[in-house]
Amino acid sequence: MYKRQPDTLQKIADSIEKTDPDIVYGETALVDSERRFISMRRLQAPERLSVKSFRMGMLVCHQAFIVRREIAPEYDLRYRFSADFDWCIRCMQMAKTITHTHEVLIDYLNEGVTTANREASLRERYEIMCRYYGTLPTFLRHLWFAVRFAFARFSGRE
């Protein structure tokens, strides 16, 4: 069971002071509208995050992804629902050092804008992935995503 830690901000500050990273990232807890814990996010942040990591989907929520201002580009506003995915990739392309805090950085409301517009979001994300990772590799990975999603739905971890 996840419990909010009162020293999360201090741990983030310590991590930044120790490694001087361009990006700091962590984990995401899903909560309901009354901020009650539901579960940890199904996709966990990888130990070592890189541009290549996002070939497997958005492994880190942008809210749990803290970027040094000097390397942070503007959001690409042609994307209505997946600009965060594109933004995270572009940030990682610019980053020299990326540090995992191993902390839950955010409580994420389970029903956000992207969730409410899932089909449009998935189309945009597919387009972004084709641009960065190639059309054929993206298509093949999406076959795997379909299997992964079906398993998650079947096991109740959608």
Which residues are covered by each model-predicted region?
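Conserved small/polar residues in nucleotide/adenosyl-binding loops
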Residues: 1-5
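Conserved donor NDP-sugar-binding/catalytic core segment of glycosyltransferases
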Residues: 6-38
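Alpha-helical elements of Rossmann-like donor-binding domains used by nucleotide-donor carbohydrate transfer enzymes
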Residues: 7-15, 86-90, 124-128
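Secondary-structure boundary motif
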Residues: 14-18, 93, 97, 131
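Short, hydrophobic secondary-structure boundary micro-motifs
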Residues: 24, 39-41, 100-101, 137-141
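Acidic catalytic patch
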Residues: 30, 102, 142-144
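Conserved nucleotide-sugar donor-binding catalytic segment
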Residues: 40-120, 124
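Membrane-proximal basic amphipathic "stem/tether" segments
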Residues: 130-158
